[in-house]
Amino acid sequence: MSDRIVVRDMEFYAYHGVFEAEREIGQRFEVDVELHLDLRSAAQADDIDQSINYVDVYTAIKEIVEEQEFRLIESLAEAIAEVLLSAYDLEAVVVRVRKPSVPIGGIVGEVEVEITRTPADLRSPANEEL
């Protein structure tokens, strides 16, 4: 069984992208996260210390998006997942990163990457190569 805390539509201005102009000019990025965990004890105790503080989640994501540099939003999503899985006792985390303005030579509303990770993914051999 899995409960969820969902934080949607976080917006940041950052300098990620494949193209040099994206990294120089910057652009808007949007992030959603779903934190899968058992929330029964927090609900029964009505105590934030038994849950996850949304401010802390937002702050951690803001630091990653605004202070680190990535060429791919896939890499940005992975970094967010790793930090959240390391910081909290989660069953899983879903991370969505959207890039509303994509320089691909056509009209596109946005591009989004969605990843799902579990604590086992932190210990996987593929992750050790990153």
Where in this protein do the model-derived segments appear?
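N-terminal, polar/charged subdomain of small-to-medium soluble alpha/beta proteins
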Residues: 1-130
